[in-house]
């Protein structure tokens, strides 16, 4: 295939900085195996495939906001899990504290 150039990709994005962000995010998606290439990847590495997809107009800056929304949802879920874990830890500590008091009372009585 012909070489993909930055100039060709810039026709589809605002500037070079946005191009880097979009290409990096897409390459990470491809390399992690969570997403399939939208073009025939052949033997190209994920970075090249990402740039080819941008050049073809298949991937744009919306990929960045989609990831942000998913990250926010995961963050909210993590906060709920953290609060559940914290309450379990507090319950465990309160039981341990009661056991310790009972042990101390038993020692005094002996």
Curated annotation (Swiss-Prot):
Promotes RNA polymerase assembly. Latches the N- and C-terminal regions of the beta' subunit thereby facilitating its interaction with the beta and alpha subunits. SUPFAM superfamilies: RPB6/omega subunit-like. GO terms for cellular component: DNA-directed RNA polymerase complex. It comes from Vesicomyosocius okutanii subsp. Calyptogena okutanii (strain HA). The gene is rpoZ. GO terms for molecular function: DNA binding; DNA-directed RNA polymerase activity. This is DNA-directed RNA polymerase subunit omega. It catalyses: RNA(n) + a ribonucleoside 5'-triphosphate = RNA(n+1) + diphosphate. InterPro entries: DNA-dir_RNA_pol_omega, Pol_omega/Rpo6/RPB6, RPB6/omega-like_sf. Keywords: DNA-directed RNA polymerase, Nucleotidyltransferase, Transcription, Transferase. NCBIfam families: rpoZ. The lineage of its organism: Bacteria, Pseudomonadati, Pseudomonadota, Gammaproteobacteria, Candidatus Pseudothioglobaceae. Its EC number is 2.7.7.6. GO terms for biological process: DNA-templated transcription.
């Amino acid at each position: 295939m012909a070489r993909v150039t930055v100039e060709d990709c810039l026709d589809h994005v605002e500037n070079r900085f946005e191009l880097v962000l979009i290409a990096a995010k897409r390459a990470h998606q491809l390399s992690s195996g969570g997403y399939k290439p939208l073009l025939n990847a052949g033997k190209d590495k994920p970075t090249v495939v990402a740039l080819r997809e941008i050049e073809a107009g298949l991937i744009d800056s919306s990929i960045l906001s989609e990831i942000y929304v998913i990250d926010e949802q995961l963050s909210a879920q993590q906060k709920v899990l953290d609060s559940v874990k914290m309450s379990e830890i507090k319950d465990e500590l309160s039981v341990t504290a009661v056991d310790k008091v009972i042990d101390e009372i038993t020692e005094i009585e002996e």
